[in-house]
């Protein structure tokens, strides 16, 4: 990535690989499985063992490494040398032979094409909003999806992120040197801050990141339509009668597409209900069979 934004983001992740971890924590594949976050385990259960998977913007590789434990073809791509170096250290230590790592700038369509294959599942979790052009990056990575392949796109929501933006402002001004407030803010998102590496990584990513954009459900539904991706559902749910703020049932199951009033109603609710996640939400869909990848 040669843009000013791209250089800043790349430099940020080269200094602060994300998610950060100490390699000594992982001495076996069992350690890796035990350390997987709950939603990673949900994804693992939702993706068939014989499916090919690519994690776009894999960072230090915890998600893609975990998914490779019971699959023969899992890729992780990123453009941060430091993050990939840590991921490669994990790959070598645990002998994760089915896990392929490659440096790729997702704004560069030629680098995307050079991957040379398509995948059954394309995951891009919390990445597009840190590029200089989220839609162009999305459009590029959709070339990696097989016809009838599945996608999961995680982004910051324009409504859900509002309270975190307020905290970011306070942390950079009034409470700039207040470690108690810093700890409080981190606890709001990840709970335990005894894991200093995780806490430092989250603080840097949420409060010190050089670039982020926010997006809406309707905007992403438009992206899906333009790229012949059938919209399935979101987590948190955009179903009008969803009871849970973070509905994890039926990953890649189809739901009724929300109308504009429902989209607005649900996203206004996310201001409070996704406060802990920083307004993060995931969009699920499936590529239509008739869509050509050329």
Descriptions of predicted regions:
Residues 150-187:
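Conserved class I S-adenosyl-L-methionine
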Residues 25-49:
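Conserved alpha-helix/loop element of class I SAM-dependent methyltransferases that forms part
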Residues 197-294:
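Rossmann-like AdoMet/SAM-dependent catalytic core
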Residues 60-71:
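Conserved SAM-binding loop of SAM-dependent methyltransferases across substrates and taxa
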Residues 95-109:
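Conserved SAM-binding strand-loop segment of SAM-dependent methyltransferases
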Residues 80:
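Conserved SAM/SAH-binding beta-strand->alpha-helix loop
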Residues 135-147:
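A short glycine-rich, Lys/Arg-flanked "PGG" loop and its adjoining helix->strand segment in the class I
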Residues 111-121:
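A short acidic, Gly/Pro-enriched loop at the edge of an enzyme's catalytic core
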């Amino acid at each position: 990535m040669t843009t000013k934004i791209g250089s800043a983001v790349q430099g940020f992740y080269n200094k602060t690989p994300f998610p950060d971890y100490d390699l000594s924590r992982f001495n076996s594949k069992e350690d890796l499985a035990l350390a997987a976050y709950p939603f990673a385990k949900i994804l693992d259960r939702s993706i068939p063992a014989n499916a090919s998977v690519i994690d776009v913007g894999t960072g230090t590789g915890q998600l893609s490494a975990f998914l490779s434990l019971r699959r023969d073809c899992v890729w992780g791509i990123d453009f941060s040398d430091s993050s990939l170096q840590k991921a490669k250290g994990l790959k070598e230590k645990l002998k994760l032979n089915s896990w392929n790592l490659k440096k790729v700038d997702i704004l560069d369509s030629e680098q995307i094409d050079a991957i040379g294959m398509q995948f059954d599942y394309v995951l891009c979790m919390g990445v597009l909003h840190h590029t200089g052009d989220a839609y162009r990056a999305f459009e590029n990575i959709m070339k990696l999806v097989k016809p009838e392949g599945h996608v999961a796109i995680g982004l910051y929501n324009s409504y859900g992120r509002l309270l975190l933006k307020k905290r970011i402002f306070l942390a950079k001004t009034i409470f700039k040197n207040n470690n108690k407030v810093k700890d409080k803010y981190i606890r709001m998102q990840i709970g335990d801050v005894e894991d200093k590496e995780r806490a430092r990584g989250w603080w840097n990513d949420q409060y010190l990141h050089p670039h982020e954009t926010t997006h809406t459900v309707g905007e992403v539904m438009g992206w899906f339509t333009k790229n012949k991706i059938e919209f399935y559902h979101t987590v948190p749910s955009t179903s009008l009668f969803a009871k849970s703020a973070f509905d994890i049932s039926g990953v890649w199951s189809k739901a009724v597409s929300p109308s504009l009033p429902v989209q607005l109603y649900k996203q206004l609710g996310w201001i409070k209900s996704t406060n802990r996640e920083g307004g993060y939400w995931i969009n699920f869909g499936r590529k239509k069979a008739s869509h050509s990848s050329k």
